[in-house]
C-alpha cells in the first residue's frame, strides 16, 4: 500500500518504516488493521512500535522496554518459532489468539 516502499518487514519479522523513504501520505495508517501507526508531527513521517529493535541494536537490550517496565507481567515478548520459549508455552497453555485473527498472520497475541 506504501507508494514509496517505506513500509517493510525485517528479517526478524517485525514491520518497520524507513523514515528516509516515507513521504507521510498516511496510506499505511489507513490500511493498518491494528490502528497502531502514528504520524510524527515534527517529521511528517509515519511510525509504529518496533519492539525496541533500534534500542536493542545500539544497547544490546534483550527485552522490549514496555515488557521490562510492566509491573504486572501483562506483556511478554519472545520467539514464536521456538516451541520451548516462554511466550510459545504461554500461547499453548492459554489458547491465545492472534490480535487480528488469522487475517494478517499476526505475531501479536492476546494471551490473557
Positions of predicted regions on the chain:
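Non-ligating segments of multi-cofactor redox enzymes
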Residues: 1-112
Amino acid at each position: 500500500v506504501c507508494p514509496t516502499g517505506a513500509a517493510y518487514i525485517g528479517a526478524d519479522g517485525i514491520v518497520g518504516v524507513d523514515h528516509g523513504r516515507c513521504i507521510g501520505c498516511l496510506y499505511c495508517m489507513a490500511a493498518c488493521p491494528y490502528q497502531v501507526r502514528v504520524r510524527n508531527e515534527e517529521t511528517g513521517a509515519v511510525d509504529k512500535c518496533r519492539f525496541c529493535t533500534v534500542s536493542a541494536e545500539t544497547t544490546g537490550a534483550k527485552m522490549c522496554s514496555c515488557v521490562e517496565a510492566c509491573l504486572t507481567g501483562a506483556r511478554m515478548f519472545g520467539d514464536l518459532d521456538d516451541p520451548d520459549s516462554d511466550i510459545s508455552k504461554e500461547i499453548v497453555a492459554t489458547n491465545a489468539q492472534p490480535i487480528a485473527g488469522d487475517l494478517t498472520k499476526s505475531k501479536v497475541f492476546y494471551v490473557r
